[in-house]
Amino acid sequence: MNFLVSILLGIIQGISEWLPISSKTQELIASHYLLGLDVSIAYTFGLFMEMGSIGSALIYFRQDVKRVFHDKFLLKFLVVVTALTGIVGVPLYVISDKLLQNAYNPSIPMIFLGIALIADGIYIRYSRSRTREFKNLSTKEMILIGIAQGIAALPGVSRSGMTVSTMLVLGINPEDAFHYSYLAYIPAAIGSVGTTLLFTRHHISYVVSLIGIDGIALAVISALLTGLVVIGFLLKIAKTKKVYLIDFMLGGIAVLVSMLGLIIS
């Protein structure tokens, strides 16, 4: 039974990480109900599960990873964005862990995220065409993207939703926005996993005691394989220039699911 739960948790991570619906919150909710985890432990586990998604990104974007140290602009982008993500995100993670111990409800920010996605979809649909390329980003714009990614440490706030939306608002074309948002995820996620091990490794130890090392490994592998499929699918959609349809759909889902969560709680 635990194996089936591990696979399901991995699939949830593998799908939700690359969609603007906050994977850590989906994992939080799923592990809370499937494993009976305390909300704060479930939040930590959701961040820890990014190990599988890191694997997906490293495999899918392996050519980009190889050229990082040969492409000064790409290296600068990753350094600036990752640094700001850490500066903003680590304190928010520590604060969030405390809030979740006091019955913080992640459905609340999910509602705001859903509304923001719908508004972003409207903005994208009716605003000027996004034709700027990634290489045209300024340092100030990289800082904004890093701050946006750092804010996503909060429960209910989507990392990909924050970074992709920020780049789209800056006029970056959808294909580049998705591509480099996913690439920026790699160092940020490594930092997230490291942060959980540094500050809340006792939470991870507790989950291991429930489903075992083999259960954790199965969940991570499931997340990795699922993520590879989802990344490819979303990048194909980004090429069609109809990203606003994703925003409308996921924004509506986020609002409905969050309202249901509030009613149930």
Curated annotation (Swiss-Prot):
Catalytic activity: di-trans,octa-cis-undecaprenyl diphosphate + H2O = di-trans,octa-cis-undecaprenyl phosphate + phosphate + H(+)
GO cellular component, one term: plasma membrane
Database matches in HAMAP family: Undec_diphosphatase (MF_01006)
EC top class named in words: hydrolase
UniProt GO molecular function: undecaprenyl-diphosphatase activity
EC number: 3.6.1.27
Stored InterPro entries: UppP
Record's function text: Catalyzes the dephosphorylation of undecaprenyl diphosphate (UPP).
Keywords: Cell membrane, Hydrolase, Membrane, Transmembrane, Transmembrane helix
Mode of membrane association: Multi-pass membrane protein
Transmembrane regions: 41-61, 75-95, 104-124, 137-157, 180-200, 215-235, 244-264
Any one Pfam family match given in the protein's UniProt record, by short name: BacA
Protein name: Undecaprenyl-diphosphatase
Region forming the signal peptide: none
Family as reported in the entry's similarity comment: Belongs to the UppP family.
Subcellular location per the Swiss-Prot or TrEMBL entry: Cell membrane
Chief site of localization: membrane
Coiled coil location: none
